[in-house]
Structure formats: C-alpha cells, structure tokens
C-alpha cells in the first residue's frame, strides 16, 4: 500500500492512513451526474459517511476528517441518537464489515442560517474513535488560503436520489464528476442567493440530489483528495443544468479547527 507510511520512527506513526489517499483508488470515467452518476469503486471514497436514524434510514452523507470527527451539513440536523456508518458501499448488504459509530457530540455552526443557508456546516465528534483501515480513512480539508479555480473537475459522492422523482435512494454508492464554477458564474443561475460562504459545481449534465446533503465535494490537490465543498442545496428537481451549491470549506476551515481544538 503506497499510501501507508511505515515510519522509521517506531511508535510515532504506526502505519498511518494519510488523508485524501484512499487505499483503494477511485476510478472516474464519466466526469457525469449522481443524477446521471455512476457507481463508485467500492470503498474508494474511504471518508464517505452515511448518517442514519435509529431505523437505519439514510438521511445525509458526511465525510470523515480524522478518526474522531465527521463533517456534514448543518441542515442535516444531526442528533445524538443518530448513527454514523463508515466503510459502507452497498446499503442493502449486511456483509461489509461497516463501522456503526455512536454520536458523541454535535457542533452546529453558531452562525448557520436556515433562510440564507449560510454556514451550512456541522461537526460530529464520534463517541469512540473510528478504526482506520483499507476502507476507512480521512479526507484532507481545504486550507483557508487554498484556491480552487472555476472549471476544475471535482467529484461528489453519495447515496442520494438518482432521479428527483425516484422512489428510493440507490443501494450502491454513486459518484459524479463536476466542474467547479466561479461564484460569478454561479450567480447567473442562482442570483444573490450565492454568498462567499458557498461554492458551486455542476451545470454540465450532472448534479447532486436529495439524500446527498452533507456529503463531500472533493478536488485533487497535490495528489490528495481534498474536501472543498459540503453538499448544501440546489434545485428541488435536481436539474442537471443547474449547479449544485456547497458550503465552501476554505471559508469554514478556521471554525472547524477551533471547534476540534476546543473539544
């Protein structure tokens, strides 16, 4: 496994799984839509989380950012009785060896606004640390000063609806490659709903859809997959000609760091 570090300093690392470098490599063919997406290589988005209620109903996605913390959208409204499922690919299978984690604490961004959907970010501290392995490893977080240009191809993943009127969400994890838009371009579709706390992607025949909320939009930075957006909102009919809107991680990174440091 080229991405595992066998440290020359015994005990310092003990085979760490670095961020943004899944042990099982993703394969992206259609750079297409989750609405028009494709099935992901099983476990290749190793930070992908399924947030589920007590009945096992999947209501939002999320991303593992280290063994103790998951990031998702504030509008997912995670509660202490919800479950965090790691290492899942096929939600209809019981044979995957998933990790079902208990929520320890929930931190919603204090300036989350459900009307403007600004600051749509929430952190979950797991009650016990996740076990990092071939199928479960963290995503890198975009830095405050990172720049991800319009036109850059990035990928979103989730178990969201593959058609807006579908009866049920897909069992198998889906992915879609989407181009980033500049906020100027995005405002051509969404007008003044778009703030600096948001980043847009899509409008090229692909879109994130309901049920993918809270899940990742990742871009490659220096060979590592980096969390650039958190699925936030978009068209109610998941129109592939309208861009999806994501919470902009570069603008929210400082709050993430402060919250993790204090808890």
Swiss-Prot record:
The active site is at 75 (charge relay system), 120 (charge relay system), 213 (charge relay system). The keyword Repressor does not apply. Pfam families: Trypsin. It comes from Gadus morhua (Atlantic cod). It comes from the Eukaryota. GO terms for biological process: digestion; proteolysis. GO terms for cellular component: extracellular region. It catalyses: Preferential cleavage: Tyr-|-Xaa, Trp-|-Xaa, Phe-|-Xaa, Leu-|-Xaa. Its EC number is 3.4.21.1. Residues 34-261 form the Peptidase S1 domain. Residues 1-18 form the signal peptide. Keywords: Digestion, Disulfide bond, Hydrolase, Protease, Secreted, Serine protease, Signal, Zymogen. GO terms for molecular function: serine-type endopeptidase activity. Its main location: secreted. It is found in: Secreted, Extracellular space. InterPro entries: Peptidase_S1_PA, Peptidase_S1_PA_chymotrypsin, Peptidase_S1A, Trypsin_dom, TRYPSIN_HIS, TRYPSIN_SER. Disulfide bonds join 19-140, 60-76, 154-219, 186-200, 209-238. PROSITE patterns: TRYPSIN_DOM, TRYPSIN_HIS, TRYPSIN_SER. PANTHER family: CHYMOTRYPSIN-RELATED, CHYMOTRYPSINOGEN B. Belongs to the peptidase S1 family. This is Chymotrypsin A.
């Amino acid at each position: 496994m080229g991405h595992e570090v066998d440290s020359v300093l015994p005990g310092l690392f003990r085979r760490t799984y670095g961020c943004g470098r899944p042990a099982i490599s993703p394969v992206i063919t259609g750079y297409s839509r989750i609405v028009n997406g494709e099935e992901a290589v099983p476990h290749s988005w190793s930070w992908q989380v399924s947030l589920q209620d007590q009945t096992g109903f999947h209501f939002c996605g999320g991303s593992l950012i280290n063994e103790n913390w998951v990031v998702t959208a504030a509008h997912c409204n995670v509660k202490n009785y919800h479950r965090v499922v790691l290492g899942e690919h096929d939600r209809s299978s019981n044979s995957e060896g998933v990790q079902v984690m208990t929520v320890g604490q929930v931190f919603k961004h204090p300036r989350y606004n459900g009307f403007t959907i600004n600051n749509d970010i929430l952190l979950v501290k797991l009650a016990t640390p996740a076990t990092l392995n071939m199928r479960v490893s963290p995503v890198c977080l975009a830095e405050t000063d990172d720049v991800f240009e319009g036109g850059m191809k990035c990928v979103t993943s989730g178990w969201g609806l593959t058609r807006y009127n579908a009866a049920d969400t897909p069992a198998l994890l889906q992915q879609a490659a989407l181009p980033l838009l500049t906020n100027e371009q995005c405002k051509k579709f969404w007008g003044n709903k778009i703030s600096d706390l948001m980043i847009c992607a899509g409008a090229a025949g692909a879109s994130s859809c309901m049920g993918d909320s809270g899940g990742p939009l990742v871009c490659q930075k220096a060979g590592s997959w980096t969390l650039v957006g958190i699925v936030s909102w978009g068209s109610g009919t998941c129109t592939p000609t309208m861009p999806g809107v994501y919470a902009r991680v570069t603008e929210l990174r400082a709050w993430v760091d402060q919250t993790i440091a204090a808890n």
